[in-house]
Amino acid sequence: MGNDRYNAVVVGAGPAGSTAALMMARNNLSVALIERGKYPGSKNMTGGTIASMPFQQILPEYWNIQGIPLERRIVSDELWLLDNDSAVRIGFTGKKFGMAPYNKHTILRYKFDRWYADQAVKAGAKLFTSCLAVDLVYHKTGPLSKKVDGVMLE
């Protein structure tokens, strides 16, 4: 990264960090997206879900995007309340859950995070991998002494 200057530095290229970088880059801000792994998602061993309604606001009709690493459509949700010797199950489904716009999708984070960070890069963000942010650098004197001037990297 050197002494490059950015309007924003986002630490972590998971879904939240990539969303922040993508939205700022779309709005013509210079953004550095810092990821400690060799690539976004390289440190993830689990999956997750993408809820359709909020994600469509970021990437409209995302389920039609070529190459997006979605796994399965989720057509029902269940919530289990457990006690030592009993359980209550509450389920919800809808006739339209299996039709576009789909309710939600499962993802494997090691695939999805890499793809999603690439969307931020295509929008103009700069991705730095194998890069660990260890501290903030503050403006040293004056009324702006609490203003962040930079990020210290390991």
Mark where each language-model region is:
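N-terminal Rossmann-like FAD-binding beta1-loop-alpha1 element of flavoenzymes
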Residues: 3-33
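Short, basic and Ser/Thr-rich N-terminal targeting/leader segments
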Residues: 4, 73-75, 129
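Flexible, glycine-rich phosphate/dinucleotide-binding loops
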Residues: 17, 40, 88
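Short glycine-/small-residue-rich flexible loop motifs, especially phosphate/cofactor-binding loops
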Residues: 21, 52, 117
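N-terminal FAD cofactor-binding segment of flavoenzymes
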Residues: 27, 37-85
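Feature captures the FAD/FMN-dependent oxidoreductase FAD-binding
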Residues: 79-154
